[in-house]
Amino acid sequence: MDWELYLNYFGDIMPLTLLVGIIYGIVIHYKNKDTYRWRKICSVLFVCYITALIQLVLFLDIMRGFSYLLIHHMDSGNINGYFHFSGAYNFNVNFWSHIDSEKIGNIIIFLPFGILYPLHSEKISYKRTLLMGFLLTSSIEILQPFIDRSFDLNDIILNTAGVFISATVFFVIKKLILNGKIEYA
């Protein structure tokens, strides 16, 4: 997949992502008065990330259709007949056969999860972050055949690798800061 295409997709998913983020931000601002401001900001960013991720990997055709409708005031044809089972699946683990932008994208798209998930709550551990990242990517892959996309075991492995990389870096830096090895301004 081309990087320019990802940037176009970004524009398609932003309206709903921002709307969900604003509504969630207002709710947690009034609901959790004693929570630190930076924790609230991290929670809003996490919710925005999850909203964007779900739109991008599960509902991109629908979101592109709505985006087209908003801009051009006409149906793009992307929404009709969307929900049906494709039956496409791939259980072959072959992500090293050739590295392309789609495989790199599968890692990159889950890098924010390993950082934002533990930042939105104090009590989230490294193991829990990895587990939740794996469960999220597995759930997304399991749902894909129901929306005319394919299940691919490589995606689960690469997405989980993205969570592993970012969570490892995050928790190592966090431990160094807490032990006084790195000064935090």
Residue ranges and their predicted role:
Residues F151, D155-I157:
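Loop-to-transmembrane alpha-helix initiation sites
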Residues M1-S150, A167-A185:
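Bulky hydrophobic segments
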